[in-house]
Amino acid sequence: MRTDQTFWGESFVHKLLGLMLLIPALHFYGLNSKQIGFGTKGLFSYVSLGLVWGSLFFALAYLIEIALLLSQGNLVRLDFYVSAYSVSGNIGQQRGLLFLLICLVGNLINVLMEEGIFRGLFQKVFERKYSFLKAAFFSNLLFGFWHTMGPFRSFLDGEMSLTGFWINSLILILTSFLIGFQFALMTKMTGSLYMGMAVHFVNNTVVNLLHVLSKGGVDQLLSLRITVAQTLSFLMLLLFYKKRKRSRNEVL
């Protein structure tokens, strides 16, 4: 069902299906929601930390983008409206409250499903045989391949050539893997999915709501913005992770 071509402007049926399949999958593998990171302990504090963390690094990325455009004399203004993300950039422009709610709820569904499956279920299943780092590698490689559905859909719709499909797929596999690996580290460090979920939610939501208008168009430097935010976030997280690992002498 192509809900991305309807009033909703977003594909969410498969994400709802993924959430529904998560429950029997947990039962099949002898796991429960708490074991994969959905416990109630630290829920508010880790969600708050994730929201602050994600917002901080995107704020820095926006500032860098704005400074760059100002130096070139190309900045027009910032704008706030709901758009949909595609592999070729943000599309659509909706300013109604209903569309804002759809955006927020849709991103929440997406975050619950992806974190529950890739950083929760798959991570725990792989950890039965491999170390944390190897398990994170495999689960987030799958997360990367999951994101090739976007360019594949564009290819089927005739919006992208076969070459474009392969190039965009490779880029998405790599970037999604690195971002997912970051969320896996957050889950390992906090013992729950909530910080990663909150950062994931900020990542998906902010690019759909806060837009940079320049003389060249809307969100012309979107890829740069995302790259800067994720790179800074990942580097800072790695510093905390290595410091924590040394202090606890953990074998991961």
Where are these regions (language model features)?
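Residue-level signature of the transmembrane alpha-helical core
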Residues: 12, 16, 47, 51, ...
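Short juxtamembrane and helix-loop transition motifs at transmembrane-helix boundaries
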Residues: 62, 97-102, 154-164, 191
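Transmembrane alpha-helix/helix-exit interface in multi-pass inner-membrane proteins
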Residues: 62-71, 136-156
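Membrane-interface helix/loop boundary segments of multi-pass membrane proteins
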Residues: 113-142, 188-192
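C-terminal membrane module of polytopic membrane proteins
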Residues: 201-252
